[in-house]
Curated annotation (Swiss-Prot):
GO terms for cellular component: ribonucleoprotein complex; ribosome. Keywords: Ribonucleoprotein, Ribosomal protein, RNA-binding, rRNA-binding. One of its GO terms (biological process) is translation. SMART domains: KOW. GO terms for molecular function: rRNA binding; structural constituent of ribosome. The keyword Methyltransferase does not apply. Pfam families: KOW (PF00467), ribosomal_L24 (PF17136). The keyword rRNA-binding applies. NCBIfam families: rplX_bact. The gene is rplX. This is Large ribosomal subunit protein uL24.
Length: 115
C-alpha cells in the first residue's frame, strides 16, 4: 500500500490579487510590486518584478532556435507586507468592521482601508 502525501497546512492569506506589496526579506528585499497570483495551498504569492527566474526553452520545431525566457517565480506570503502607495510605507494589517457592517482590511500604521 502506498503512502499518500498529506496536504500542506493552509494558512489564511493576508494579501489578495491586485494588492501592492513590499518584500521584507530575501534577495529582493525592499522591492515593491503588485500581486499577480496567489497560491493559498502553499501560502505563496507571485509578485510582478520580484523573484525573476530564467528558463532555457528548447526549440520545438526543426530550424527554430531555442530561447531564454524569464518569469516571476512564487515567494512565500510571510516574506511580503502590504504597502501604502500614498504614504510610501509598508504595514501590517488588521481587520475592522465599517459603519455599514462590512469587514475590511486596514493598514495598522496609516489607518488606510484597503478593501
Amino acid at each position: 500500500m502506498t503512502k499518500t502525501k498529506p496536504a500542506p497546512h493552509r494558512v489564511k492569506m493576508h494579501v489578495k490579487k491586485g494588492d501592492t506589496i513590499q518584500v521584507i526579506s530575501g534577495k529582493d528585499k525592499g522591492k515593491v510590486g503588485e500581486v499577480l497570483r496567489t497560491i493559498p495551498s502553499h501560502s505563496q504569492v507571485v509578485v510582478k518584478g520580484v523573484n525573476i527566474r530564467t528558463k532555457h526553452v528548447k526549440p520545438r520545431q526543426e530550424g527554430e532556435s531555442g530561447q531564454i525566457s524569464s518569469y516571476e517565480a512564487p515567494i512565500h506570503s510571510s516574506k511580503v507586507m502590504l504597502y501604502s502607495t500614498k504614504e510610501k510605507i509598508a504595514s501590517r494589517i488588521c481587520y475592522t468592521v465599517t459603519d455599514d457592517g462590512r469587514k475590511v482590511r486596514m493598514l495598522k500604521k496609516t489607518g488606510e482601508i484597503i478593501d
